């Protein structure tokens, strides 16, 4: 338990340190307060360059395409879809669900279920916080039942607090229910798929990743040259995943 907490805290600190916005702020502060004044213009120019690079949609898209898992699942059907948590706020409850920007994984799951591509839905995840008692999987299950998904088609794993535990506890749940020989479609956000798939491949489950087709490249002038503030956040998320992936490699989780 202590090791889990230390690993969790260290990963959060490291995630903050690789945030491009953090780098830009540091460079701007150096441009204002560096003792050697002749270096201040260099820091300012560096900050401007980083701002342009990390707010450029085309640069981000090209980089992300290299990171993204590619998989064609057309016309395949699966016994169950495994839906990873991380799509609601810690302030959520059964009566008041606050979805975040990662709710695409839930929408994709619903679409796949109603198309008959997945027969059952396994929801995995408690919360990504050591201090929260939130059981995200239970909340999502209640939501799915309210919107018409049959209760018997939903399976919950509500103990895991990170991607590694998602894989471990999901495998245990499937073995308990004698589902470990099923075919599974792994459903999460695209940026998170590489680490998730690697964790689940370490289990004995038959896993296939669900990946949507990439967006077409835009050639309008605004997309190509106008900086986008939301892209800074996308870079933060991507760097967090890259760091998380290699930390998991170091720990032997993937």
Which residue stretches match the model-derived regions?
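Short, Lys/Arg-enriched, disordered terminal segments
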Residues: 1-11, 37-38, 146, 178-179, ...
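Membrane-embedded alpha-helical segments of integral membrane proteins
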Residues: 2-34
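Hydrophobic alpha-helical segments of integral membrane proteins
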Residues: 6-14, 59, 63-67, 235, ...
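Short, aromatic-rich membrane-interface segments at the entry and exit
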Residues: 24, 39-44
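Structural signal for the C-terminal ends of transmembrane alpha-helices
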Residues: 30-38, 55-57
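Hydrophobic membrane-insertion alpha-helices, especially the h-region
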Residues: 43-57
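A structural signal for short, hydrophobic/glycine-enriched beta-strand patches
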Residues: 53-229
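Periplasmic OmpA/Pal-like peptidoglycan-binding modules at the C-termini of bacterial envelope proteins
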Residues: 219-239, 243-245
């Amino acid at each position: 338990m202590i090791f889990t907490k230390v690993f969790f805290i260290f990963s959060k600190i490291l995630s903050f340190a690789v945030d491009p916005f953090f780098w830009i702020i540091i460079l701007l502060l150096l441009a204002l307060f560096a003792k050697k004044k002749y270096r201040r213009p260099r820091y300012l120019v560096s900050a401007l360059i980083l701002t342009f690079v990390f707010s450029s949609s085309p640069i981000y898209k090209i980089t992300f395409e290299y990171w993204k898992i590619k998989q064609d699942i057309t016309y395949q059907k699966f016994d169950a879809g495994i839906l990873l948590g991380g799509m609601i706020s810690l302030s959520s409850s059964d009566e008041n669900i606050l979805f975040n920007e990662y709710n695409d994984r839930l929408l994709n799951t619903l679409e796949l279920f109603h198309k008959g591509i997945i027969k059952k839905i396994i929801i995995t995840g408690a919360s990504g916080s050591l201090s929260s008692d939130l059981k995200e999987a239970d909340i999502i299950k209640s939501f799915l039942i309210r919107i018409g998904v049959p209760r018997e088609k939903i399976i919950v794993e509500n103990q895991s607090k990170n991607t590694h535990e998602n894989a471990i506890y999901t495998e245990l749940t499937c073995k308990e229910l004698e589902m470990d020989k099923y075919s599974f479609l792994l459903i999460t956000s695209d940026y998170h798929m590489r680490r998730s798939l690697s964790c689940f491949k370490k289990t004995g489950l038959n896993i296939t990743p669900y990946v949507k087709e990439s967006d077409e490249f835009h050639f309008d002038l605004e997309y190509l040259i106008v900086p986008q503030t939301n892209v800074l956040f996308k870079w933060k998320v991507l760097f967090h995943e890259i760091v998380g992936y290699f930390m998991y490699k170091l720990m032997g989780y993937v």
